[in-house]
Amino acid sequence: MAKNRFNQNWLHDHINDPYVKMAQREGYRARAAYKLKEIDEQDKLIRPGQVIVDLGATPGSWSQYARNKLAQGKKRDTQREGGIDGTIIALDLLPMEPIADVHFIQGDFREDDVLRQLEDVLEGRAVDLVISDMAPNLSGVASADAARIEHLCDLALEFAQNHLKPDGALLVKCFHGSGYSQIVEKFKQQFKVVAPRKPKASRDKSSETFILGRQLKQPR
């Protein structure tokens, strides 16, 4: 009974969520687009000519926002291939519906085949910005969930270390709670500038937060 009440309350909140309504109106696949938008407007992350990698991209709202941002200022028809000033590569274990001008690679980015596909698109270029909205399936067991969250952040940090430009940036989703301070410390070990971000589009009841790292301390 309590579970049904929880589901009904969540559905009510979701339907009446202004960000959900705005996403539907503006064509975004998820309200998460506005989290990235707010952080981008604050920190000026996305700029013309950049190479951007979106980890855990499905359903694609972050890639959509990045694509729209890179399309601004293009005089040609931005719905056609080549309609953005830059490159966006989206990766996920799950399938994703195509987005114009976004290269999608399905698979585990730790595997050689996926990395080869990534390198084919990069054509020797380093990455300006890595964004990760990856999140594990939470079990409700705090210690287990903290370990899963930290693992995903570790994967994003390793990917960034291997692919970012020296002055590049990494933005990842994490959660306040057990293990959060360890994640922040790992960011500080890897980046010169580290800042937490809690966009207004992130639900008040959620412990979700984001960590932004800029300028690698030891670029490869």
UniProtKB/Swiss-Prot annotation:
EC number: 2.1.1.166
One term under GO cellular component: cytoplasm
Name by which UniProt lists this protein: Ribosomal RNA large subunit methyltransferase E
PANTHER family named in the record: RIBOSOMAL RNA METHYLTRANSFERASE, RRNA METHYLTRANSFERASE 2, MITOCHONDRIAL
Catalytic-site annotation from UniProt: K173 (proton acceptor)
UniProt region (Disordered), positions on chain: 197-220
Annotated residues for binding of S-adenosyl-L-methionine: G60, W62, D92, D108, D133
GO MF terms held by the record: rRNA (uridine-2'-O-)-methyltransferase activity
One Pfam entry name: FtsJ
Family in the record: Belongs to the class I-like SAM-binding methyltransferase superfamily. RNA methyltransferase RlmE family.
Keywords: Cytoplasm, Methyltransferase, rRNA processing, S-adenosyl-L-methionine, Transferase
Gene that produces this protein: rlmE
Protein's cellular compartments: Cytoplasm
Role of this protein: Specifically methylates the uridine in position 2552 of 23S rRNA at the 2'-O position of the ribose in the fully assembled 50S ribosomal subunit.
SUPFAM superfamilies with a match to the protein in the record: S-adenosyl-L-methionine-dependent methyltransferases
Organism encoding this protein: Burkholderia ambifaria (strain ATCC BAA-244 / DSM 16087 / CCUG 44356 / LMG 19182 / AMMD) (Burkholderia cepacia (strain AMMD))
Reaction(s) catalysed (UniProt annotation): uridine(2552) in 23S rRNA + S-adenosyl-L-methionine = 2'-O-methyluridine(2552) in 23S rRNA + S-adenosyl-L-homocysteine + H(+)
